[in-house]
């Protein structure tokens, strides 16, 4: 029995579980050989992979540094304190909780800390770019709270702050949420703050998508305006799949209690270590350069997708451009629906996701739009030349201007020109 246990404990993944190892090898090959343009995805640095695959996964640590419910937490206390302090410094926040396992759990904790069941919540309509946790009826947020929604105008597809104010004055919400899952423009945090103050509401900003841009100083920061800010640590931040809450100090105790024991038990210390690494990287000039390329790439993509060949096919860019890392493509007047557009690009080696557009006539599993992001390719090393090439490939594909095999060859050449995870040998994951 002892020999069997020792053998299992010391075997590599490839030796112990070849089926799983093969699936992981396939994913590594997919990421290397295709172009990842799902706006919520990114590639983590090697150091983040190392932190997540460390012995910290072994340690239970319910509670917070200095106030744990388990012994032996002296090292994980150091880890969590590093992550908290780095997050506060990076975003200029008074308080940080780095324990949420995901963005959705961070959002649940925010709402638990600020609201009681039945209280009123005002957020961006899911169909207009909001997130599930901002009041979607099947989500906990839609079931626990009385939800009111604002949207975008039919004319320019931008949030109308006069409408937000009108709805807020009528609904008198306890919490107003700004932030989005699919919206290509900056939001006016000062205007949201003024409306929240006028109606006596808390202001919560979900910056999951644009946190990396904020960290780099390339997007207006919500931190000076919001009572509470939540985020994921992946997406533009490029860290592990996980959540983060920032707040003014007066909300610290309630937020800590809402995370633990309100939403979670033991924190994932290996993930918190990976967050600490990501926050350190996000303070570097290299990271800022990456965010510059992310923005530049999105603008190049938006400009190409407004070209005559694309417009002639009834395809347009929502709001006419972008301020962030993503472009929303409107297919309502074209021969394509969102599912067909996603499949067409997948066939040539570009991964995007179909996405509803405001006032979408099609069902959510089909949609009339595409959400295309540039963060992962910027992390990979793409600059303006590469983004110009991939933008032309996408535009040509959607407009039907070339055959799939030719376009797949262009994608393959780009992937080879800017290789992914060089030096990260397969044994690191599979050996």
Curated annotation (Swiss-Prot):
Native organism taxonomy: Bacteria, Bacillati, Actinomycetota, Actinomycetes, Mycobacteriales
Assembly with partners or alone: Homodimer.
GO-annotated cellular components: cytosol
Family designation: Belongs to the SHMT family.
Binding-site residues, (6S)-5,6,7,8-tetrahydrofolate: 126, 130-132
Domain of life: Bacteria
Biological process, per Gene Ontology: glycine biosynthetic process from serine; tetrahydrofolate interconversion
Residues carrying the site annotation Plays an important role in substrate specificity: 234
Name of the gene: glyA
Stated name of the protein: Serine hydroxymethyltransferase
EC number(s) reported in the record: 2.1.2.1
Compartments where located: Cytoplasm
GO MF entries: glycine hydroxymethyltransferase activity; pyridoxal phosphate binding
UniProt KW keywords: Amino-acid biosynthesis, Cytoplasm, One-carbon metabolism, Pyridoxal phosphate, Transferase
Cofactor requirements of the protein: pyridoxal 5'-phosphate
